[in-house]
């Protein structure tokens, strides 16, 4: 869960694209906005409407993939489902979007095409910041542990590393962490560090 324009949002994306994007010749982005008919009070999809929104997404993406378009991600927020796809055939892709969405006459939608050579929408909007990314990876670890029957309530030792630019900051943090019940195993000045980290 995150926020878009200070409103609750759910973003799902293809993280693997970060290693290869921008993909050569895929210079145009298709943005498809579908208005939800029954969103929750916070603008996300309701349990009742979720299955049909999945059907809409599947229909659109499956058609666009026949052109080898690249699905980048979705956003659910403010009563809308947004789909983002990169294409090298913008006109054909737009036609396929329209065909796919005709199957859902009860839904209002809008489709637009824009040049996005650097994949800005992917890297600057869909892709998570460092903290969100770490939360996603932590969630993935927890899910894997649960699948393997791990007892998540079992206490276990966890190591943390902190870096400081001054000895004063180090000492203040050490004092506070000890007050919170943490054990400090070591603290020392880093050797061969140009920035004098502690």
Predicted features along the sequence, with ranges:
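Long, contiguous binding/interaction regions
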Residues: 1-198
């Amino acid at each position: 869960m995150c926020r878009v324009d200070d409103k609750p949002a759910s973003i799902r994306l293809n993280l693997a694209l970060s290693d290869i994007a921008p993909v050569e010749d895929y210079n145009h982005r298709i943005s498809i906005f579908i208005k939800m008919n029954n969103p929750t009070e916070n603008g996300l999809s309701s349990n009742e409407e979720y299955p049909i929104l999945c059907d809409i997404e599947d229909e659109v993406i499956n058609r666009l993939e026949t052109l080898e378009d690249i699905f980048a991600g979705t956003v659910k927020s403010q009563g809308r489902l947004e789909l983002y796809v990169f294409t090298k055939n913008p006109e054909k892709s737009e036609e396929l979007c329209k065909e796919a969405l005709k199957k859902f006459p009860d839904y209002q939608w809008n489709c637009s095409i824009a040049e996005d050579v650097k994949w800005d929408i992917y890297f600057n909007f869909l892709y998570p910041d460092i903290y969100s990314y770490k939360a996603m990876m932590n969630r993935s670890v927890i899910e894997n542990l649960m699948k393997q029957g791990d007892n998540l309530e079992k206490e276990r030792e966890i190591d943390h590393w902190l870096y400081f630019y001054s000895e004063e900051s180090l000492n203040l943090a050490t004092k506070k962490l000890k007050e919170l019940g943490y054990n400090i195993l070591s603290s020392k000045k880093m050797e061969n560090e140009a920035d004098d980290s502690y």
